[in-house]
Amino acid sequence: MLRGSDAKRGYMRWWHSFQGICPTTQETRTFFVEYSILNPALGTSQPILGQHPDYKRHGLKPSYLCIKAGVFPEPGDSGLQLRAYYPLTSLQVAQDPFYMQFEDCVYSENRISGSIDISDEVARHRSLMTDAGSFIWDLEVHKAVACHTGYIANAFFTAVHALESFWHGEGIRTFFRGTVILNGVTYEVTPETSYGYADKHWGRSYNQPWLQFASGHLISEKTGRELKHSALAIDGCCPKFLFFPMRRRILMQLTYTGEDFEYHFGRPLTLSR
């Protein structure tokens, strides 16, 4: 969790994406669930939204818990993004193993669950940046392949804010199992077809521009078949020297049939581990 000055000026987010199949129509959709925390040391009994006109008028810095969940667009469907905000006073956290809960939204290393229900009236408030709809998820999580970012994400470089935003690709190949219910329609999520991804970002600000790409479903151009035990993850970052931003870099890992190939400035002399 965020500590020290980062607790007053920092964020942490846990991202998950995966596929689910509707058993009645066989429709396949790609879903996402994100848990995030912003400026926890400034929290009160109400979520403080930085984009809200009243809070801006009084000079209050944003501080809240947020759940963002929904479904990615498909041809003929614009997708759905739901956001719900919660006060820091509702947060419950345990360590070893890490566990986090606010309201009915639960995060742990091997399970995520929760629900969002946004009415049309609430969605009309532009400051909330949300669509209307409902989303329920209950999923087991198995993170099979992690991206190794080396020393650049250790405690020292985090403390001196060597990056604007740190990344840990803790599950660039993740298996999900469970169900999601999108606007009353149930989708089943199975490990073999979930093609899941999970990661964590933390820091003082989001990278701008934001660059992130990942895939757990790679197809060989040579054979036309799926590459087993393979995944690709790319993340952009902006390193600093003496608090001055340097040229933007990328962090990348390709896992090819079980073998990891890494490319980032944290491992300047090797491309593979």
Predicted regions and their residues:
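Structured soluble/peripheral alpha/beta segments that form catalytic or ligand/cofactor-binding pockets
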Residues: 1-273
